[in-house]
Amino acid sequence: VSLLNSLPLEKFEVDLLALDPTGIFRDNLPDGLRFVNPPGEMVCQHVRINEGRFWRHVTFKTLCIKLRCIMGNHARGRKSRARMCHTQYYNAVWKRHIPDLPKKYDVAVSYLDGMNYYVIDHVCADKKILWCHNDYNKLDLVPAYDRSYYAKADKVCTISDVCLKSLIDNFPSMDDKLEVVENISSPRIINAQADMTAEMTG
């Protein structure tokens, strides 16, 4: 949200794809954004099966894929778990069933860790920027799986020198595309959140 509020939107045309466009930060988004509805397959991939949003988007096909992921992940052996974590396993199963975005972009930014795979696999853009908001060593991810995705990105951004070091340790051959972009603090967002907290405690 802070990144979007910091951009000079009068100079750019910005599309925003959000899994939950009615989320808690919806009112803090700047004017001028164009919202792109996520495909139902993408929602079903990321939303838990016991949530209402899953059932609002589900089809017989996506229900079968979801159940396959759940049961398949439980049944995976040691070799499979060494190649990919459950998030990466889910992506490997779902990616062939999720449609590509029809529009071509100058730049595509995956601002959340879980969307890195989507941007690489399903978005057509001249440049692609991925994000890692945490110390990679503390994430339940297998570097060997992510290596092919990071290789296709123009930049992989993270939020601190500590997080950068963890990326370099895991992807030493890609240090030229790894970069720190510290968290952006928007005064407007901070004030809005403070007002929200005051209302909740008030």
Task: Give the ranges of each region predicted by the language model.
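A short, glycine/small-residue-rich beta-strand->loop->alpha-helix junction that serves as a flexible
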Residues: 1
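N-terminal strand-loop element at the rim of the active site
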Residues: 11-81
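Short His-centered aromatic/hydrophobic patch
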Residues: 70-74, 90, 109-115
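Short N-terminal targeting/anchoring amphipathic segment
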Residues: 82-87, 96-113, 129
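Membrane-proximal helix-turn-helix segments that form the acceptor-binding/catalytic region
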Residues: 92-105, 135-159, 163
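A short helix/loop element that forms part of the nucleotide-sugar donor recognition site in Leloir-type
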Residues: 96, 190-202
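A short, histidine- and acid-enriched strand-loop-helix "catalytic/donor-clamping" loop
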Residues: 114-118, 125-142
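Donor nucleotide-sugar binding/catalytic pocket of nucleotide-sugar-dependent glycosyltransferases
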Residues: 127-133, 137, 151-192
